[in-house]
Amino acid sequence: QATGITEINVRDAIATYEMSLVTPSRFDRYLGGDRNALTAAEREGLTEFVNAGCTACHTGINIGGTMYQKMGLVQNYFQRRGTPLTDADNGRFNVTHAESDRHFFKVPTLRNVALTAPYFHDGAAATLDEAVRTMALVQLGRTLEPAQVQRIVTFLNALTGEIPAGARMPPNEGTPAAAPAAAPAAAPAAAQ
């Protein structure tokens, strides 16, 4: 018998929804001790991911999602992108209005990252390869060789999990389009 909106029903609905978000991957089996859950190439990619410094931000069971970081920690991401700044580029500043939060964004989880292109808050990276190269450069100050990028991408693909039966994928509305290749002539952005 339905009882309407109650604290218990809301709690149960949220718990049921959160259970649908769990998408176990082969990486979880690997973490659980199944050494063969990842291929040799995926294990090499994991090693490359760690050695490149990606785990400085992408940590924990969700491989990210636990902290905020400045976009362009080592190299100015926005200058490199080459398009005018937008309000969205201000990141956490838009919420806190603290200057120290300008250009800070929540580090995303990398689970199912192969399914979530385009990448970054502005959709500027169309592929995982491009996202890995850009992050290595602007966040870590590293230029990765193509083989290193490919190894990391191979590992990232292993983070794709199984979508639970009955789960519905969210609508694709609101996904940012890739940033324009050239800056429009009107309204130059203020330097940050």
Spans of model-derived segments:
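Periplasmic c-type cytochrome electron-transfer domains
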Residues: Q1-Q192
